[in-house]
Curated annotation (Swiss-Prot):
This is Small ribosomal subunit protein uS13m. The keyword Disulfide bond does not apply. It comes from the Eukaryota. Belongs to the universal ribosomal protein uS13 family. Signal peptide: none annotated. The keyword Ligase does not apply. Keywords: Mitochondrion, Ribonucleoprotein, Ribosomal protein, RNA-binding, rRNA-binding. The gene is RPS13. It is found in: Mitochondrion. One of its GO terms (molecular function) is structural constituent of ribosome. One of its GO terms (biological process) is translation. PROSITE patterns: RIBOSOMAL_S13_1 (PS00646), RIBOSOMAL_S13_2 (PS50159). Located at the top of the head of the small subunit, it contacts several helices of the 18S rRNA.
Length: 116
């Protein structure tokens, strides 16, 4: 197991696939990281040298907002919506869909959670 920015990467997976398991890094960003490091995306995590791992960790830490930082930002945005009492904040508070979806026949799981 390898940990980068608090995210666990499986050693038996290819680098480009393992990086996509990090919250905030998709397939394109994973390929971009591999390209900038000068490594093939097809080699496995366990085949990387300590230097390559350090370089990857440094690059991801500097250039990309990932994992807990991204989740904290999203949570702060939702709390801000709730604090200013905008439409989206009220819908978040009530546990209802916020992008105009109908609630008469759909969104049942959201409405069940409210009744508890």
């Amino acid at each position: 197991m390898l940990y980068i920015s608090g995210a666990r990467l499986v050693a038996d997976k290819q680098v480009r696939i393992a990086l996509t398991k990090m919250y905030g890094i998709g397939p394109k960003k994973a390929i971009q990281v591999c390209y900038r490091l000068g490594i093939s995306g097809n080699i496995k995590i366990k085949e990387l040298t300590k230097y390559q791992i350090d370089q990857m960790e440094q690059m991801i830490g500097q250039d990309h907002v990932v994992h807990w930082e991204l989740k904290r930002g999203e949570r702060a945005d939702i709390e801000r919506f709730i604090s200013i009492s905008c439409y989206r904040g009220i819908r978040h508070q009530d546990g209802l869909p916020l992008r105009g979806q109908r609630t008469h026949t759909n969104a049942r799981t959201c409405r069940k959670q409210i009744r508890k």
